[in-house]
């Protein structure tokens, strides 16, 4: 597509920035405006940062909102690419960015005033390749009582993957890479490129089976290199949770189903790497011997706390939705050669080379 810098681009960056802030968005102009408003209040010189709004095909007022803020920041760029998937915005902005440190945030988070300064502090040690900060949920309405079943506690602090909450206390500390999430995903640009970029992340509902392990996949690759992940409490963001996300079990259903898709995605990539001579059908047979039906039916239960007492409705969701997602992904992997190619891409940096499946091109 016009204007895309390829992974091997020789284009000289006009200016090396300290920090590139990348916001992936689609049809959430009001939420986006709140996020950029918060960025405008950061305690940092705007000459040190650049902001990218990566629009994944919005039909609302997102372009107008972006243009308004482009007049405020000296280094601001709006990227429009309607091809489906969060991966598009992530990687388009990655190759147009000039920051030594990259901050990928969602359009429903609002960085706190000292966030940018603390982001840069997080990478003072060369041993740190990836980082995050506190993620503070802000509910539009009081959440239902059953949500407490999905808030977990460990020796680091409290967290909830479903609700995007992370509170590991007031001290800077090393953490497992699995706790660096896309709502507040901080990484060295060099490390991101060496890791091969993101795996597929969020997808529209009708293409949900094309999702992958996204941000978490990058973290695990980074960890394999020996680099460490850091939690900096000052690199905090507020995470807006609207009432429609918390008033029913629909979000839980979508999330657990997605966990099933991701479980299959990760499994098939691992099996293909370990068994490079096997065909797609053979890999499916191998998958059936690798993961048990009990493991499949328990997909998502690792995100419940030990005292969980689920309602019958939620218990049914946890018993069925993860396995449904897993089976659907396996079905597509078995019958669709182009889908297999998508899942087994070495990396997704070259978007034009990766986006060949007809379903991903039917915009």
Annotate the PLM regions.
Residues 81-97:
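Glycine-rich, basic loop-to-helix element that forms the pyrophosphate-binding segment
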Residues 102:
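Short aromatic/hydrophobic "clamp" motif used to bind/position activated sugar donors
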Residues 38, 55-64, 109:
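A conserved acidic beta->alpha catalytic loop
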Residues 180, 204-218:
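Acidic donor-binding loop at a coil-to-helix junction in glycosyltransferase catalytic cores
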Residues 28-41:
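Short, well-formed alpha-helical segments that are part of the catalytic scaffolds
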Residues 114-151:
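Conserved donor NDP-sugar-binding/catalytic core segment of glycosyltransferases
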Residues 152-177:
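Short, flexible, basic/aromatic active-site loop/helix in glycosyltransferases
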Residues 224-228, 234-237, 248-286, 300-304, ...:
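Catalytic core of nucleotide-sugar-dependent glycosyltransferases
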